[in-house]
Amino acid sequence: MSNTAYIGSGTTLSSKYYLRSFYRSNREAGTSSKRREFSGNQLALADGRALRQAVRRLTSSDFSDDQDANTRNSVLAYIQTYNNMLSSAGSSSDRTLERSAKQLKNITSEYSSELDKIGITVNDDGTLTSRTTLFESADLSKFKELFSADAAYMQRTSTYANGLQAAARRLSLLTTTG
């Protein structure tokens, strides 16, 4: 039996649904109340995997009008996942993880103007925040320009998400075997 849910026209899924989906390999790492129970390495690994899932989800979106709410909700979940990754990488003592997180922040900063146009603010610390009114009213084509498979921002983010996950996996293996 398949675990895949097929979403028809008119079905709206919450950002919490997408967040749980991104953290499917470790769901508790995606909840703010449970994150403190994990080591930094465990969080970095879970966040790296989740960020890769978020990028995959967004780059496979069709950005059609009938999926408008789902697209916006998956972007909201991406924001939370991105912020979680920066937090766990920032608290790590691993230079590779820190460097990849810094590069991810730099890439996002390069796109701050485009993100701002759809209601996403790049904060001074590199984290992202959505501004509800503009986020909910921004044209879906602007989301597509940033988050589709052809978008340079997503392509570059994907590269660093892969690097973050690999660094976190390596760090996790070192701490469990050493």
Language-model regions: role of each:
Residues 1-178:
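Polar, low-complexity export/assembly segments characteristic of proteins
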